[in-house]
Amino acid sequence: EISLGLVGSEMCIRDRPGDIKYKDVNGDGVVNDGDIVAIGSTSKPNLIYGLGLSATWKGLDVSLHFQGAGKSQFFTYGKCIWAFTEGQWGNILKGTLDNRWVDAETAQKLGIPANENPNASYPRLSYTDNGNGNTTIYEYKNNYRNSTYWLRNGSYVRLKTIDVGYTLPKKIVNKIHFNNVRIFMTGTNLLTWSSFKLWDPEMGASRGEQYPLAKSITLGLSVNSVSYTH
């Protein structure tokens, strides 16, 4: 939840509008490390599956291979989404700025438009510690603690490979003294369905600083010549 007001707690001493507000899990009236509980599942998928389909019609053939993973969650963190952290003081990604709470004071300092959007995907833009005053320990910073706010679903379904081919009719290939001629196209990692959109969910990466699996398309021609005997 993005807070629209101040919260009195040990964990969040300097909360401002747009900061993350945490639940008082144990109900003692104070939000602190005593409210930390286990959440989510493992970043390694507990379910991996696949499905293969193929069909032919006259000279046309199509083969599909789907791959998926489920029962997986991971926390997102790092400089890709946490503005002005890890020594990256000069720049932030445009996508994280455009969909973030930016109060008028910060906007004026940075020379950018204010964006006090209560439905923003990211909390208040800040370039100083907004936790309990400890500027050296990341875990103590209010907006950048592991929580359900940063927990993401790692499940996905991917069209891993697709192969489409066309075999020329025999009456045509025999005239040019071939036994079989097939034209084909093979694609890899062309489509992915996932609720997670920031980077490739198959990487299982929390920071998004790895190369995603490459998409590829291959065009080919398969030819079998006629064998003659004497």
Where are these regions (language model features)?
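Surface-exposed, extracytoplasmic segments of Gram-negative outer-membrane nutrient-acquisition systems
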Residues: S9-E10, R14-S43, D61-L151
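Surface-exposed extracellular loop regions of Gram-negative outer-membrane beta-barrel proteins
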Residues: N46-V62, L168-K170, S222-V223
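Single conserved hydrophobic/aromatic residue that forms the stacking wall/gate
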Residues: E1-G8, I13, Y228-H230
